[in-house]
Each structure stands twice: as structure tokens, then as C-alpha cells.
Amino acid sequence: MVGDEAHQFKSKSLVSIMSKLSDAKYRFGFTGTLDGTQTHKWVLEGLFGASYKIIKTDELMKKGHLAKLNINILLLKHSPNKFETFEDEIQYIIGHNRRNNFIKNLALDLKGNTLILYARVEGHGQPLFDLINNNKSDDRQVFFIHGGVETENREKVREIAESENNAIIVASYGTFSTGINIKNLHNVIFASPSKSRIRNL
């Protein structure tokens, strides 16, 4: 049994499948992103066996296998609001015109390939894509990726980004966060809030 992106094997369906593979002589799970909790590690070790750290992320960066990382936090100030639910707060954030215009201007001003990650296709991804695409220069390519885009088309966009130096990719977290490696990526903008360690790494 080989499990790629093994950190996702904590879901009930995959745990159920793995527990039925009692005759599997070999079990290999590969991931670059555990969620940092001991429980998650124990679940994966119960499914695959002892874990081994083969190489560190900074070593992969030094060897040129991963894009080098530099984090800049841009803090936007909003007028204080109280929200009844988390969903109300999310809707406020993703529908905030000044915030979305800031993201658009930032993406258009940044030099190099830029990846913009969002969580909701219709509510945030499509409006951001339209905003950026309608204001870009003619020589700049903007791509929109979500779960409805065929895998081969996603791969084409990734390949274009490897050879381009000024593309913008507006992509959902589910399609372009874990397991995607674009070495020629210069900027990442987290357009939607997320506290998932795996998603952010």
C-alpha cells in the first residue's frame, strides 16, 4: 500500500480502508506536512508504521527542489464588527470590496508569478479572478483554477507557471495547496482565512 499525501489518511473512509488491509505486506505513506499534533502522528503511524523524517524543507529549498520562502504579513485594518457566527465573519471578509481591491492591486503590482489562494469558488474565487483579469495588462496571463477544472488543465497551468515569469494563478485551496510544487513561484497571497497548518504549508 502506498499513500501519497498521507496526512489526509486521518479521514474515516481512508482509516476504514487501511484497517481492512491486514494482509498488506508493505505500507508506505508519504507527506511533507503533518498537522503538528501528536494524535495525527499516532494515527498515521498506526496505519503505516513508524515515521521517518528523510529531509527538511529548508534542505529541499537549498537543493532547488522547492521554491524559497520569505513571509511578509500585510495587516489590513477593518472597522470593529461583532458577528453572530463564523460564517457571518467569513462572508464579511470575502465580500469586502476594499479588501478584494487591495488583493487585486497587490497581485497586479507584484513582479513574478503570483498564486492567489481562496476557499469559495463562487463567493470569492470567481469575483477575484474577474477583478484581476479585467484590470491586467495585455501581456499578463491570469488563470482560474477550481475543482471543476480538469486535472490535465491544472497541470498545464502549473507547467506554464514554470516557464512564465509574470503569470497570476487564482486557485482554490483544494486544488493548489498541498501536493503542488511550482519552483518558479515568486508570490503567494492567502486571500481567504485559514488556520489549517497543512493547508498553509
Model-flagged regions — what are they?
Residues 81-119, 123-134:
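Conserved interdomain hinge at the start of the Helicase C-terminal
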Residues 19-24, 38, 65-67, 107-109, ...:
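Conserved catalytic network of the ASCE P-loop NTPase/AAA+ motor domain
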Residues 2, 7-70:
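Post-DEXD/H (motif II) to motif III coupling segment of the RecA-like Helicase ATP-binding lobe
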Residues 5, 30-34, 119-121, 171-174:
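A short beta-strand-to-loop transition that corresponds to the Sensor-1 phosphate-sensing loop
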Residues 170-171, 178-193:
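A short beta-strand element within the Helicase C-terminal
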